[in-house]
């Protein structure tokens, strides 16, 4: 990794996941259909809830002379950025907080992005992600294993197949 070319300091080429081809599929069926066709539900994961959150953005459309103009200079951003909004809603809906999470599988397009998710998920304070990693807390067997699958570096970024692979990984881990 350290011998690979610098892409954007401090990230090097091998710190960033390569975009790749791939495919994934999930079969979603009712309990009765699965029992009828499989004979048993042993080893079959069940879904008890599904939720989505749509981030909120400013509702103002400024009249700007140049499309490349930074609209944040004219329109204030939302109080909470989209990841904060989504995480707040997910934790509230699940009735848990970051301290209750026992594993995580995050989108880690780069090594830096995985560290950012540690902070965004509330697994550590701002600026403490590297310390959490160095303590081994995010390793398999640690306090909060993160990306025990190996993350995107292990199977590539085949959008959206990698998201399904990560959902499968979390299901297997649970």
Whereabouts are the PLM-identified features?
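Condensing-enzyme catalytic core mediating Claisen C-C bond formation in acyl metabolism
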Residues: 6-85, 89, 137-149, 153
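Stable alpha-helical structural segments in soluble proteins, enriched in small hydrophobic residues
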Residues: 25, 34, 82, 86-94, ...
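Active-site-proximal alpha-helical scaffold in enzymes
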Residues: 26-33, 155-174
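Short glycine/threonine-rich loop-to-helix capping motif typified by GTGT followed
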Residues: 57-64, 108-131, 158-161
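Extended C-terminal subregions enriched in glycine
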Residues: 74-111, 152-158
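Short mixed-charge
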Residues: 128-140
């Amino acid at each position: 990794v350290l011998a690979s070319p610098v892409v954007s300091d401090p990230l090097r080429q091998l710190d960033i996941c390569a975009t790749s081809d791939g495919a994934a599929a999930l079969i979603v069926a009712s309990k009765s259909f699965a029992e009828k066709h499989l004979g048993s539900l042993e080893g079959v994961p069940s879904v008890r809830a599904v939720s989505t959150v749509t981030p909120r953005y400013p509702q103002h459309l400024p009249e700007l002379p140049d499309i490349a103009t930074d609209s944040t200079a004219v329109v204030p951003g939302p109080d909470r950025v989209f990841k904060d909004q989504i995480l707040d809603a997910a934790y509230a809906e699940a009735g848990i907080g970051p301290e209750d999470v026992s594993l995580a599988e995050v989108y880690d397009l780069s090594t830096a992005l995985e560290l950012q998710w540690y902070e965004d998920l509330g697994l550590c304070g701002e600026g403490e992600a590297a310390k959490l990693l160095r303590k081994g807390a995010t390793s398999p067997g640690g306090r909060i294993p993160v990306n025990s699958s190996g993350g995107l570096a292990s199977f590539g970024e085949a959008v959206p197949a990698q998201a399904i692979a990560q959902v499968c990984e979390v299901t297997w881990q649970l």
